[in-house]
From Swiss-Prot:
Protein species of origin: Pectobacterium atrosepticum (strain SCRI 1043 / ATCC BAA-672) (Erwinia carotovora subsp. atroseptica)
Database matches in InterPro entries: Exonuc_VII_L (IPR003753), Exonuc_VII_lsu_C (IPR020579), OB-fold_nuc-bd_dom (IPR025824)
Source organism phylogeny: Bacteria, Pseudomonadati, Pseudomonadota, Gammaproteobacteria, Enterobacterales
Described purpose of this protein according to its UniProt entry: Bidirectionally degrades single-stranded DNA into large acid-insoluble oligonucleotides, which are then degraded further into small acid-soluble oligonucleotides.
Name assigned to this protein: Exodeoxyribonuclease 7 large subunit
GO cellular component: cytoplasm; exodeoxyribonuclease VII complex
Pfam families for the chain: Exonuc_VII_L, tRNA_anti_2
Assembly notes: Heterooligomer composed of large and small subunits.
Amino acid sequence: MSQFPSSAIFTVSRLNQTVRQLLEMEMGQIWLSGEISNLSQPSSGHWYFTLKDERAQVRCAMFRTSNRRVTFRPQNGQQIIIRATITLYEPRGDYQLLAESMQPAGDGLLQQQFEQLKQRLAAEGLFDQQFKQVLPSPAKQVGVITSVSGAALHDILQVLQRRDPSLPVIVYPTSVQGAEAPLQIVRAIELANQRDECDVLIVGRGGGSLEDLWSFNDERVARAIFASRIPIVSAVGHETDVTIADFVGDLRAPTPSAAAELVSRNQLELLRQIQSQRQRLEMAMDYYLAQRNREFTRLHHRLQQQHPQLRLARQQAQLVKLRQRLDDAMQQQLRQTSRRSERLQQRLMQQQPQTRIHRAQQRLQQLSYQMQSAVDRQLNQNKQKLGVACSRLEGVSPLATLARGYNVTTASDGKVLKNVAQITPGETLKTRLQDGWVESQVTTLAPNLSSVKKRRKSSSQS
């Protein structure tokens, strides 16, 4: 018999089911803050992530029907606040949170509000370039809307004093941080427009956190800047700080000191410009006087050219020149006519028959002499070639060999005999001498022993 009652023994499934029911009934919905990690966004549209702090973490899920209402894109490392239900995933025994809503925490929430306001005002056209006013150059009086106790005012006044001490400055004091600051900034802008004593305004403050600068991200401040008839330079924080006022303002300065430089004139630069203008004016005067002097010289020269005596002298010189040209032309014409007459006379002389016949006879005699010389030269060359050929022919002729005492012996069949082996005793042979033939009959053969040895050796080698 078992020592445990069966009703006290849980199965794993029953235990997980009981724990899930307890969690859902006892805890209900809760608000939870933490840092996102292990964020997963599969194609199903659901979100799975872990919410953690420095000592613990818990798994979370947010289904597609809920995350559709989230107005920002969550990222790992981001601090958020969620409203969720605690439950337990029975197959694994893991408890988790089912998030129903999500919003950024701290600066993340402020950044979300900043982006939403920025998009809305941009859609209304408050940032359009066509509404930007041009800053006066030079400014006659500058208004500064900022805190009288902040470093921004000190920096602005110091820069204006250094660059343009004669430029008047009016300060419209206001708070730049806190709940009341946006309304005070709006009233200062409206007051400056009502008094209409400045032709440019600097609105800004020194650096700080996003929360410290939040007054310049207020919609009321943005609309007051946009409605201002006086051009406004936005100078909020440092160069890396960006506010809504920077987008709405007519010009953005990275710092309050830079804003003071933008609205003021540099005295040294002004002196340099005056000197430059003076130099340009002097150069223009010098150029104008030089032009007038050249014009006077030209007119004086023209007046001298129109004097009657000078005109008469020019006409006389022209007459002499024309007379010389006429003489030259006549001489040229006479020379050409003389040369043409000489050429015609030469051609006439060349056309007389006696001269042509004489030239033809001379040519015929010359050709006859050349032909005779060529024939004699060719005959001599042929005689020389014939003599050389006869000498060479006699050198290789058999008759010449016979004339030197040699003979040629043939067998009865006419075959030329070259050695004893071709002859048999009793055979009749014919011998050719220089001046005839001799027939003889072979009685004895006496071969040369050295020739026989050579033939045998040659036969054995082959």
